[in-house]
């Protein structure tokens, strides 16, 4: 049964170490089975590795990586006259960060490094340098939107 109203969005609290809501969302994304402590130690450990590797503030490197991962355009299926078209649409800001975090964590999990801490750190470093699987995912999404530009007039 459908809702009468939209479910309210829960406000995410900024994390205690970096005072950033984006870091909290990353921790939530990495968390499995409600083990927030484990997820937090993975994220903070990865940030320590980033700081050692670059000498820069880990939060700045992470934000740069997110900027390089977050998509601007995506395609959505739209049914017109019996056939489905992939229509390119702009991505809302909230969805941009959600997709960026999802792609970052997915790409980290598929990497070959030994621990999740290492994988996450390397993926963030790669993404900040505009390389890596998560950036490739964004490029593929943009390429798909560009290829279907002819159907942009079906936008709703």
UniProtKB/Swiss-Prot annotation:
UniProt xrefs under InterPro entries: Ribosomal_uS7 (IPR000235), Ribosomal_uS7_bac/org-type (IPR005717), Ribosomal_uS7_CS (IPR020606), Ribosomal_uS7_dom (IPR023798), Ribosomal_uS7_dom_sf (IPR036823)
Role, per record: One of the primary rRNA binding proteins, it binds directly to 16S rRNA where it nucleates assembly of the head domain of the 30S subunit. Is located at the subunit interface close to the decoding center, probably blocks exit of the E-site tRNA.
Lineage: Bacteria, Bacillati, Bacillota, Bacilli, Lactobacillales
One GO BP annotation of this record: translation
Binding partners and assembly: Part of the 30S ribosomal subunit. Contacts proteins S9 and S11.
rRNA-binding found in the keyword field: yes
Keyword annotations from UniProtKB, A to Z: Ribonucleoprotein, Ribosomal protein, RNA-binding, rRNA-binding, tRNA-binding
Transmembrane annotation, as ranges: none
GO cellular component: small ribosomal subunit
PROSITE patterns: RIBOSOMAL_S7
Entry-linked PANTHER family: RIBOSOMAL PROTEIN S7
Protein name, per record: Small ribosomal subunit protein uS7
GO MF entry, a single one: rRNA binding
Pfam family, one: Ribosomal_S7
Family from the record: Belongs to the universal ribosomal protein uS7 family.
């Amino acid at each position: 049964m459908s809702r009468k109203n939209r479910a309210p969005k829960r406000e995410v609290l900024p994390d205690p170490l970096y005072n950033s809501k984006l870091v909290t969302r990353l921790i939530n994304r990495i968390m499995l089975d409600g083990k927030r402590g484990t997820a937090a130690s993975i994220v903070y450990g990865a940030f320590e590795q980033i700081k050692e590797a670059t000498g820069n503030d880990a939060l700045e490197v992470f934000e740069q990586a997110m900027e390089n991962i977050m998509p601007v355009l995506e395609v959505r299926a739209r049914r017109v006259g019996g056939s489905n078209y992939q229509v390119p649409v702009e991505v809302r800001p909230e969805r941009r960060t959600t997709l960026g975090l999802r792609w970052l964590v997915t790409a980290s999990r598929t990497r070959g490094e030994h621990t999740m801490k290492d994988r996450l750190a390397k993926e963030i470093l790669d993404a900040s340098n505009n390389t890596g699987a998560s950036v490739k995912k964004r490029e593929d999404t943009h390429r798909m939107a560009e290829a279907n530009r002819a159907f942009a007039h079906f936008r709703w």
